[in-house]
């Protein structure tokens, strides 16, 4: 893709997201979603082959269906309230339709089937954009409509998403699919807290984006797409491989890493609201996520593949790419736990 075209496409993606985030009018939000969706499809198809074509088609069909459902919900709401304002949702059916549309856009269960398939079919760079930037717009709308959302529906979706995110990743050897299932689980945690403390959802989203960006950037250094290629990285980049493994444990929510903060805070907030069973179930199902990350760490770090001695010297001569953004991203993705007392300002 030529640089001017790429710049225009990226600018359109950003503009679409910004329109959604800054609008309080349903029509503008819908236009922002459409701009964002149509601009991201060429990014997904950057490396043109049947796999990317299939992934882009799946993405388009899902997002178009979600946009249609959203507009349907908006129209029903308009019929009953006579207003296009986001905060005024007076009809329960409209609220449910909007929630379902946004869960489809986010890839929450039971509308999650497109996420692993699309992520697996595209390049690492496109996957990184899909699992980070593309979550911001739907989450911002969910944040705005959170007072009108059906609590039981969203808690059910959140619980099932955390379960599916953990269960789906258990048998995977493809790193992109593992990241996709991890994304489903993280979105589930965010959906669970959004009604009770929307500000905490933003904290969770920021930490999730930081951890996912760092992990994808490290995968891109060596074009690692499978657990086997990750274990081969020990010979080329021993330090980077060990950082990837720490980041993965952070994504799994292992204390004392940054990924533990949102889980801890969400469980605390839900129990404050007299909810005991749901946070308990979510904490138990989160162990599935941690298990497959631990298994990946074990298979990569502790079971070394046979290699010749000259291979072990390879890292000294390897010309590494420039990684200016990586050090601050890695630090924030792993070492933020001591700053947790500062979160008291959220209350």
From Swiss-Prot:
One cellular component term from this protein's GO annotations in UniProt: mitochondrial inner membrane
Q: Which UniProt keywords apply?
A: Electron transport, Membrane, Mitochondrion, Mitochondrion inner membrane, NAD, Respiratory chain, Translocase, Transmembrane, Transmembrane helix, Transport, Ubiquinone
Q: How does it sit in the membrane?
A: Multi-pass membrane protein
Q: Where are the transmembrane segments?
A: 3-23, 25-45, 66-86, 96-116, 122-142, 149-169, 178-198, 201-221, 237-257, 274-294, 323-343
State its Enzyme Commission number(s): 7.1.1.2
Gene Ontology process terms (BP)? mitochondrial electron transport, NADH to ubiquinone; mitochondrial respiratory chain complex I assembly
According to its UniProt entry, the function of this protein is described as: Core subunit of the mitochondrial membrane respiratory chain NADH dehydrogenase (Complex I) which catalyzes electron transfer from NADH through the respiratory chain, using ubiquinone as an electron acceptor. Essential for the catalytic activity and assembly of complex I.
Q: What is this protein called?
A: NADH-ubiquinone oxidoreductase chain 2
Biological source species = Canis rufus
């Amino acid at each position: 893709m030529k640089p001017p075209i790429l710049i225009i496409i990226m600018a359109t993606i950003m503009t679409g997201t910004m329109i959604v985030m800054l609008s309080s009018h349903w029509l503008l939000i819908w236009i922002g979603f459409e701009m964002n969706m149509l601009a991201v499809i060429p990014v997904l198809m950057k490396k043109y082959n049947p796999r990317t074509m299939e992934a882009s088609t799946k993405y388009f069909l899902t997002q178009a269906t979600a946009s249609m459902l959203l507009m349907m919900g908006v129209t029903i709401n308009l019929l009953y309230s006579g207003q296009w304002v986001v905060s005024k949702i007076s009809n329960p059916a409209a609220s449910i339709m909007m929630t379902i549309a946004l869960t489809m856009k986010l890839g929450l269960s039971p509308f999650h089937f497109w996420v692993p398939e699309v992520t697996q079919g595209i390049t690492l760079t496109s996957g990184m954009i899909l699992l980070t930037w593309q979550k911001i717009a739907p989450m911002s709308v969910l944040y705005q409509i959170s007072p009108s959302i059906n609590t039981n529906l969203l808690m059910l979706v959140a619980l099932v998403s955390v379960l599916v995110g953990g269960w789906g990743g258990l048998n995977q050897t493809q790193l992109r699919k593992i990241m996709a299932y991890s994304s489903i689980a993280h979105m589930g945690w965010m959906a669970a807290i959004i009604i009770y403390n929307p500000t905490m959802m933003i904290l969770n989203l920021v930490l999730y984006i930081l951890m996912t960006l760092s992990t994808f950037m490290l995968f891109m250094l060596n074009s690692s797409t499978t657990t086997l290629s990750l274990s081969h990285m020990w010979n080329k980049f021993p330090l980077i491989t060990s950082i990837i493994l720490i980041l993965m444990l952070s994504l799994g929510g292992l204390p004392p890493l940054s990924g533990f903060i949102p889980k801890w805070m969400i469980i605390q907030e839900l129990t404050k609201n007299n909810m005991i069973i749901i946070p308990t179930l979510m904490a138990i199902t989160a162990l599935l996520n941690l298990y497959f990350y631990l298994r990946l760490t074990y298979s990569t770090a502790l079971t070394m593949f046979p290699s010749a001695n000259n291979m072990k010297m390879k890292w000294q001569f390897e010309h590494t790419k420039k990684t200016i953004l990586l050090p601050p991203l890695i630090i924030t993705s792993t070492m933020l736990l001591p700053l947790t007392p500062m979160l008291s300002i959220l209350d």
